[in-house]
Amino acid sequence: MNRIGLIQPGRLGDIIICLPIAKYLTEKGYHVVWPIFSNFKTMIEESVDYVEFISVAPDVYLTVPCAYRAIMERYGSIPIIDIAATFPGSTCTKEYSILGDGFGEEKFDQFKYRLAEVPFNEKWNLQYKRNLEKENELFDKYVKEQNYDVVGLDHSQGRANFKVESKNQIIE
């Protein structure tokens, strides 16, 4: 089986958005080797069995060179798809910036899928293993009303500064 490396070591949302890329490559016969932030590795491995994940330090400034090195040390020279736009050391950051940093005509997820040569409609082919026992435990812990809204205000640049208002229970 041919190996291929995928460079997108983090943020969690980017990893989830790119999982269908790895699935597509796996279905095409590749053994996908994907360095990701060490603090995400166990969680992602519990849910995804079609990728070989490698831990790299969750330091945005060093992680891309470390990811390349981790692949090379383990497998030597194999093809690598770098889709880690905006991470220092990524080979695609310059093109990404020229195209509008994900806010131009081509959105950030479209950019990643194009570079990986994966049809964009594969984005919706997210496949993972579920743990219903843990899901129900979390549901029971947080959901206190029949109607609820789940919001995420934290992002890579900090925290969104606005008040969320709803007639429903708000789960942050």
Question: What would you call each of these model-derived segments?
Answer:
Residues 1-172:
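Catalytic machinery of carbohydrate-active enzymes
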